[in-house]
Design a protein with these regions (language model features):
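Single conserved hydrophobic/aromatic residue that forms the stacking wall/gate
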Residues: 2-5, 9
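Acidic, glycine-rich A-domain
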Residues: 17-191
Length: 191
C-alpha cells in the first residue's frame, strides 16, 4: 500500500496501471502535470512489465467515463513488433469468450481484444492494417482506421460482439471474395 503519494512511484508501470486514479486523488497537481508532460512527449511512461490485456481489462471495467490518459499512454508505450506484414486477425467476440482467464478478473475476450487491436494497428500490410474479421455466422471486415484512441477501438470491438455460432467456412469465403474483388496478389494474402 502506498502512503507517500509525492514520491516518484508514479513512473512505475504497474503502479500507473493499478493506482492511476489514486494518484489523481492524492496528488492531483503533480499527476496532472505528469499527464500533461506525457501527452506533450516530455516524459515517458514505463509499460514493460504488463500484458496488453491488463490495460484492456482496466479500460473495459469503466465504460462510463472519459478516455483514461494513463491507460492510453500505457498502450501507446508498448513495444512495436518488427514483422507484422501480412496478418489478418479473425476476432471471436462470442459469448464463450466472456469466460474468466486464469481465474482472474481478466476475460478471454479481454485477451482477444488486446491481440486484435495490437496486431491490426501494427500490421504493415496495405490490405489488412487496422482491419479484422468478425468470427461469427455472418463474418464482416471491420475497419479501425478512423479510431485514434484505444477507447474508441474498444468501443467498435464491443459493437461486434456476436453471440451467434461461429462459421469458419464463411470467414474463408469472405477472405477469398474480398481478395478477388481487390485483385490481391497471392503473395499478399494473409498468413
Amino acid at each position: 500500500r502506498i502512503s507517500d503519494w509525492s514520491s516518484d512511484v508514479c513512473s512505475s508501470d504497474l503502479a500507473n496501471l493499478i493506482y492511476r486514479n489514486a494518484f489523481m486523488r492524492h496528488d492531483e497537481e503533480r499527476r496532472s502535470k505528469y499527464l500533461e508532460d506525457l501527452s506533450n512527449g516530455d516524459v515517458k511512461i514505463n509499460a514493460g512489465k504488463m500484458y496488453l490485456y491488463d490495460i484492456i481489462s482496466k479500460y473495459k471495467n469503466k465504460w462510463d467515463v472519459e478516455a483514461d490518459e494513463t491507460l492510453e499512454a500505457l498502450w501507446d508505450a508498448q513495444e512495436v513488433p518488427k514483422d507484422y506484414n501480412d496478418i489478418l486477425v479473425v476476432r471471436d467476440g462470442s459469448g464463450s469468450m466472456t469466460t474468466s482467464a486464469f481465474g482472474t478478473s481478466v476475460s478471454v475476450l479481454d485477451i482477444a481484444d488486446a491481440l486484435t487491436i495490437y496486431t491490426t494497428q501494427h500490421n504493415k500490410s496495405e490490405y489488412y492494417k487496422d482491419k479484422f474479421i468478425t468470427f461469427s455466422s455472418k463474418p464482416e471486415i471491420v475497419d479501425l482506421s478512423t479510431c485514434n484512441m484505444l477507447r474508441d477501438k474498444l468501443s467498435v470491438l464491443d459493437e461486434y460482439d456476436d453471440w451467434s455460432t461461429t462459421n469458419v467456412e464463411s470467414v474463408f469465403n469472405l477472405i477469398l471474395d474480398t481478395s478477388v474483388k481487390n485483385k490481391v496478389d497471392a503473395k499478399d494474402l494473409p498468413s
